[in-house]
Amino acid sequence: MSLIVSPFAVIAASAAAVAGVLFLIYAALKSGHRDASLPPGPPTVPLFGNELQIPKADAHFQFMKWADEYGGTFSLKRFKNTTIVISDRKLIKELVDKKSNVYSHRPASLVSHLITHSDHLLVMQYGDTWRMLRKTVHQYFMEPNCEKEHWKVQEAEAKQMLYDFLTAPQDHMLHPKRYSNSITNSLVFGIRSKTVHDEYMERLFYLMEKWSLVQELGATPPVDDFWLLRVLPQWMTGHWRHRALEVENLMQSLYTTVLDQVRDRRARGINRDSFMDRVLDRLDKVPLTESQLRFLGGVLMEGGSDTSSSLILTIIQAMTKFPAVQARAHAEIDRVVGADRSPAWSDAAQLPYINCIIKEAHRWRPVSPLGVPHAVAQDDEINGMVLPKGATVVLNVWAMHHDPRRWPEPERFEPARFEEFPALAPTYAASGEWDKRDHYGYGAGRRICPGIHLAERNLIIGVAKLLWAFEFTQPVGSYSDIDPESGASQGFLHCPKEYGCGVRLRAPEKRDTIVREFQEAQEVFARFD
């Protein structure tokens, strides 16, 4: 039997094939194209858009150059994705703060989902679950609780930090990490980090390094915007899935272990009234899944440990490079506190220059130069430009903090810039006036860091005590790099690379004070034994 194919069928099949090819070509051209309604930006190429122009690390430097060229709001195309990069402080107030119901979402992220199962407060989508978890965190770390309860732990841990610097100055890169991690773990889990070699601390900072590298903008292929990247061999796409699953395993292991320790303690009848104790006490009223419990404790461990320690390390390094700043800080502290005690939180109002130093550290070396991306929940329009639903929104913190029109000589560490901002950061973040914001180190809008009150006190207490006790210098022949492009770690979180530092006790009589106060701190530490 012979088959006879109609000429019309051949023509129809050919036409369909041609149409299919033309559609694919059109889709490819459309994918990377920037619509005229979008904010301006660098020229695109078909299919890829601007993807090939975005650095795989430290993109904030290039983004600042583009901001100089295209303005405080520019757009990038990453295949079909639209990314809006904002360094216009007024616009951030108008959008992220005042339209928080539209700009509090996170971009869809397969990588984040693989790591956190969508249960991590930092990358969780905006909605009822996020609001419930955020409220739970806020209630424990709001300012009244910091003033009434948490400061005791902060003071005690800062006293140990002084003792650690006094007795082991060679570990200067580790002491601020132990300080911030122990405060966080004590308050969140009722578990101290007693030494710089604490297991949980070491595991946390190791996973944070991996997590930071995976989450950095440009470091992972845009697998959410071009499906083919999901199925290509891993060796062709930077092993993104393997890297994500490695972080997931590290997080699950650590956070499960710590939560299990809290439960074991409670099973023995010991309730330390930590954050996690209170959460477990209320599970009948606020039910959480096991995954939500693990990541709720985990996100607090991450945020509370990393930001404060990175900034303290930045400040110590700055003191070695800008001795006039350190001398002024010493003089201010000496006017308020003698050698018989170290500064306390109750002295903060009399130490305005210390507050300025902390603000300048946020500005000079922001821990997260591009923040955590937001997403647009619905089409929006600003200044005649369309910000489409689903677009990624990046707050260009680095550009705002290093704008020479706002901050002359931005690479100079000059705390006096902030003398017009005497209050703590939460005051200016809550201000309705965009030009009254001091810095963006804690984010913006409803996604602002929920531990902002605790973090401010960590920094003021820790830095004031350190500068009361010590003079920090750069030893002859040691290495200390403050170049922003080579002196900091890579990732979406930045910390100074290891640097040489001399630690000199400012007065012999302060040695006895440091030892005595460390002994007095044992009364607070006993609560966690």
Curated annotation (Swiss-Prot):
Q: Which reaction does it catalyse?
A: 3-hydroxybenzyl alcohol + reduced [NADPH--hemoprotein reductase] + O2 = gentisyl alcohol + oxidized [NADPH--hemoprotein reductase] + H2O + H(+)
Q: One Pfam family for this entry, by name?
A: p450
> What is the uppermost EC class here?
oxidoreductase
Q: Topology relative to the membrane, per the entry?
A: Single-pass membrane protein
Query: By which gene is this protein encoded?
Result: acuD
> Which pathway, metabolic or otherwise, does it act in?
Secondary metabolite biosynthesis
Endoplasmic reticulum listed as a keyword: yes
Q: Which Gene3D superfamilies match?
A: Cytochrome P450
Q: Which family does it belong to?
A: Belongs to the cytochrome P450 family.
Which species is the source of this protein?
A: Aspergillus aculeatus (strain ATCC 16872 / CBS 172.66 / WB 5094)
Q: Where in the cell is it found?
A: Endoplasmic reticulum membrane
Name of the molecule in the record: Cytochrome P450 monooxygenase acuD
